[in-house]
From Swiss-Prot:
ABC transporter domain ranges (all copies): 8-256
Record localization: Cell inner membrane
Organism classification: Bacteria, Bacillati, Cyanobacteriota, Cyanophyceae, Nostocales
Tree of life domain: Bacteria
One Pfam family named in its UniProt record: ABC_tran
Primary role: Part of the ABC transporter complex PstSACB involved in phosphate import. Responsible for energy coupling to the transport system.
Any GO CC annotation of this UniProt entry: plasma membrane
InterPro entries in the record: AAA+_ATPase (IPR003593), ABC_transporter-like_ATP-bd (IPR003439), ABC_transporter-like_CS (IPR017871), P-loop_NTPase (IPR027417), PstB-like (IPR005670)
Cited Gene3D superfamilies: P-loop containing nucleotide triphosphate hydrolases (3.40.50.300)
Full protein name: Phosphate import ATP-binding protein PstB 4
Class of enzymatic activity (EC top level): translocase
Length: 261
């Protein structure tokens, strides 16, 4: 294996909603150009952890973070950090497609236009490239100026991925990207993730309950579980093959066996 370079370093991270502690003492590294999966039972703080990686949790009120999250050696929780820039570099795809009520083209171009003025032909190229990167161009190139809301659920989710890719992030966070999709649509999203994994230097972090899928698409896996007080903690982190086949912790083993049968 080539030398692993951390894109994100998490050190002793704890997270609170008001006075309620959701995460406690999480430390791990997310490696550049690798796919890291976050697994664990419902309610153990997986999605909360994901949103800590680009400060999306701060869109809600009364939150508090302790510890450090470093993105290429810069603490993202320093006051001087530009949040818009951070969230372009560490972009996020949510469980359900959150498209704007506008055309396919405008959905993809939206983030590009916010960054600054560019000639229309350049934006056209960016939109086409992002849709191709999301394995969507051939399916919808004849209707990119029609409403994005008319697409199927699977196409809408891949369009959200295209929109994220259009701003050239270094890290892509995906929270249950196949949530609610039928098996065929889910497989297309999985194939897209595999394709991005093989042909790009994009770092991806994926939260999922679908362990068979995670075993196929991820390089590393982190297992989270709530303690006796239902506070989410990192139980074990390592190569996906190791976590799935010979984990160190009995709690990891029990969870993996219960999900895989």
């Amino acid at each position: 294996m080539s030398k692993l370079i951390p894109a994100i370093k998490v050190n002793n991270l704890s997270f609170y909603y008001d006075t309620q502690k959701i995460l406690e003492g999480v430390s791990m590294e997310i490696y550049q150009s690798k796919v890291t999966a976050i697994i664990g039972p419902s309610g153990c703080g997986k999605s909360t952890f994901l949103k800590c990686l680009n400060r999306m949790n701060e869109l809600e009120s009364e939150v508090r973070v302790e510890g450090r999250v470093e993105f290429f050696n810069q603490n993202i929780y320093e006051r001087r950090v530009n949040l818009n820039r951070l969230r372009r570099q560490v972009s996020m795809v949510h469980p359900k497609p959150n498209l704007f009520p506008m055309s396919v083209y405008d959905n993809v171009a939206y983030g590009v236009k916010i960054v600054g003025w560019r000639p229309k032909l350049e934006i056209d190229d960016i939109v086409e490239s992002a849709l191709k990167d999301a394995d969507l161009w051939d399916e919808i190139k004849h209707k990119i100026h029609k409403s994005a809301l008319d697409l199927s659920g699977g196409q809408q989710q891949r369009l959200c991925i295209a929109r994220a890719l259009a701003v050239k992030p270094k890290v892509l966070l995906m929270d249950e990207p196949c949530f609610g999709l039928d098996p065929i649509a889910s497989m297309k999203v999985e194939s897209l993730i595999q394709s991005l994994r093989l042909r790009s230097e994009l770092t991806m972090v994926i939260v999922s309950h679908n362990l068979p899928q995670i075993s196929r698409i991820s390089d590393f896996t982190a297992f989270f579980k709530g303690n006796e007080s239902r506070i989410g903690q990192l139980v074990e982190f390592g190569l996906t093959k190791k976590i799935f086949n010979s984990p160190h912790d009995s709690r990891t083993r029990e969870y993996v066996l219960s999900r895989l049968g």
